[in-house]
A protein has these predicted regions:
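Active-site-adjacent structural elements that line small-molecule/cofactor binding pockets in enzymes
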Residues: 1-135
């Protein structure tokens, strides 16, 4: 039996996204197969480092590093209490990727990720949408 699929997909292929920051396996797999890469809750400095590792893996497999869209998960917390309530026991682990401070400080921090090569940001936590809109 043949069935029609209408409307047709916009994309010719489904993009493959790889998430994580493991430098030996995850980033190597991303270099080989990913259309996009996302790393959660890292500092701008760690994003720079992991992005460089991904670039190195791409070069090792003969792939143009610019073929992979690079993104980062970030959270926004107004206060330490907000961070704790959003993430509980994980608060310290995600802290490097949490935007805090004034709107100007948040914008500056986002600029650091942009300078490091982040093309998209994924806001995490219930306060993210409000704070993104305000900043």
């Amino acid at each position: 039996m043949n069935a029609r699929n209408e409307p047709r997909p916009i994309q010719k292929k489904i993009p493959i996204w790889i998430g994580g920051g493991g430098e030996k396996r995850t980033l190597n797999i991303a270099a080989k197969y990913a259309d996009g890469w996302n790393v959660p809750f890292v500092s701008p400095e760690a994003f720079t480092h992991k992005s460089a590792v991904l670039t190195s893996h791409c070069e090792a497999v003969g792939r143009d590093p610019s073929d992979i869209k690079r993104t980062v998960n970030l959270a926004i917390a107004w206060t330490e209490e907000s961070l704790q309530s959003q993430f509980g026991v994980m608060a310290n682990a995600v802290r490097p990727g949490v935007l805090t401070g004034s709107d100007e400080e948040v914008i500056d921090r986002i600029g650091q990720y942009v300078e490091a090569g982040a093309e998209l940001f994924h806001g995490e936590g219930p306060e993210a949408a409000e704070r993104w809109a305000e900043a």
